[in-house]
């Protein structure tokens, strides 16, 4: 390892927490790297690009897609090194205190500190467990909603009873011809307000019921009917549909922490047990965003930004113990003087 390969901060994860960590560590003049498993930055927000996000202070309602664009632009302000399509499988600490991050392809990355910002983990949607279902993924079997327009004036059935399924049912109900929701249990498990909205809408719900068969049309390329089975009565029915959406949750890949030789405290079999300063049980290793769990945690995107700032501040002091506890606010920070002048010139045109 040479000094060019050694970074002050390596952020694992390129979602909101990871991107803000990169921005703030650049603000604090640290050499920064982002490593992201997906082929693009943005994290889980890519799952809902057309959903409106209201709960970020000072930011007017914005689509997920637009928020990603802004987060990426901000996160790259100080030109961190970005490594995409790369899965970190383990973290070890060398005798000199430097962290070595090993990838699934055998590559190694070296860093003085690490911020884990992997959100809910590497997420893979749980597929519909019906033989032959995968062949319809190229036509009308969906595991996410990338465009609301696709479902305009269509008859749609959604399978699932959690927040994602309920949210999409509420989003699509005003624009689809008809929305059905089927759930294997007796009661929905989403947020109370969202459930109430759904039950007061024109959407039709089937409880204790699952999709048990997908029936293709004459062209054998798309689903034309779904078979529904009620688990209590055994009754079987068929619905004519245009689109099927499956929201059965996600399978988490947690090999990163399972393979780590570090004694990282974990809660609920996944989350990093930390504190309000984003510190973990391992000195020099911090967490930000959904992966971090502690009393008083704010489970919003805005909370991820606070986690990120705290993690960076602690990383800065870990590397440089006499450094200021906090970074200078942007309105008085020397690093922005030139940029501010350029922005003001543009505003005056």
Curated annotation (Swiss-Prot):
Its EC number is 1.18.1.2. Gene3D superfamilies: FAD/NAD(P)-binding domain (3.50.50.60). Disulfide bonds: none annotated. FAD binds at residues 36, 44, 48, 88, 123, 290, 331. The keyword Oxidoreductase applies. Binds 1 FAD per subunit. It catalyses: 2 reduced [2Fe-2S]-[ferredoxin] + NADP(+) + H(+) = 2 oxidized [2Fe-2S]-[ferredoxin] + NADPH. Its cofactor is FAD. One of its GO terms (molecular function) is NADP binding. Keywords: FAD, Flavoprotein, NADP, Oxidoreductase. The keyword Oxidoreductase applies. It holds the Pfam family Pyr_redox_2. InterPro entries: FAD/NAD-bd_sf, FAD/NAD-binding_dom, Fd--NADP_Rdtase_type_2, Ferredoxin-NADP_redctase_2. It is an enzyme of class 1 (oxidoreductase). PANTHER family: THIOREDOXIN REDUCTASE 1-RELATED-RELATED. Homodimer. Belongs to the ferredoxin--NADP reductase type 2 family. This is Ferredoxin--NADP reductase 1. It comes from Bacillus mycoides (strain KBAB4) (Bacillus weihenstephanensis).
């Amino acid at each position: 390892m040479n000094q060019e390969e050694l970074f002050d901060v390596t952020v694992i994860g390129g979602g909101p927490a990871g991107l803000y960590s990169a921005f703030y560590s650049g603000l604090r003049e640290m050499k920064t790297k982002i490593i992201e498993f997906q082929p693009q930055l943005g994290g889980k927000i890519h799952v809902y690009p057309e959903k409106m996000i209201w709960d970020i202070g000072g930011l007017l309602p914005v689509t997920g897609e637009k928020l990603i664009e802004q987060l990426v632009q901000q996160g790259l302000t100080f030109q961190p090194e970005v490594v995409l399509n790369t899965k970190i499988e383990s973290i070890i600490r060398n005798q000199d205190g430097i962290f070595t991050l090993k990838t699934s392809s055998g590559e190694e990355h070296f860093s003085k500190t690490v911020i884990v910002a992997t959100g809910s983990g590497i997420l893979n949607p749980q597929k519909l467990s019906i033989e032959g279902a995968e062949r319809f993924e190229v036509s009308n079997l969906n595991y996410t909603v990338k465009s609301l327009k696709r479902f305009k004036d269509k008859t749609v059935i959604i399978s699932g009873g959690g927040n994602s399924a309920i949210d999409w049912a509420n989003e699509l109900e005003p624009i689809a011809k008809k929305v059905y929701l089927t759930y294997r249990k007796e009661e929905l498990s989403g947020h109370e307000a969202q459930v109430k909205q759904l039950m007061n809408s024109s959407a039709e719900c089937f409880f204790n019921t699952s999709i048990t068969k997908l029936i293709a049309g004459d062209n054998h390329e798309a689903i034309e009917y779904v078979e529904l089975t009620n688990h209590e009565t055994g009754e079987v029915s068929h619905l004519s549909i245009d689109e099927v959406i499956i929201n059965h949750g996600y399978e988490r890949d947690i090999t990163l922490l399972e393979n780590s030789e570090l004694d990282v405290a974990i809660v609920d079999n996944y989350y990093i047990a930390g504190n309000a300063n984003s510190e973990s049980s391992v000195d020099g290793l911090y967490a930000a965003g959904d992966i971090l769990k502690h009393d008083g945690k704010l489970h919003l995107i805005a909370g991820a930004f606070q986690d990120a700032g705290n993690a960076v501040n602690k990383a800065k002091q870990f590397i440089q113990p006499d450094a200021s506890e906090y970074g200078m606010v942007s309105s008085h920070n020397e690093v922005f003087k030139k940029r501010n002048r350029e922005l003001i010139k543009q505003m005056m045109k």
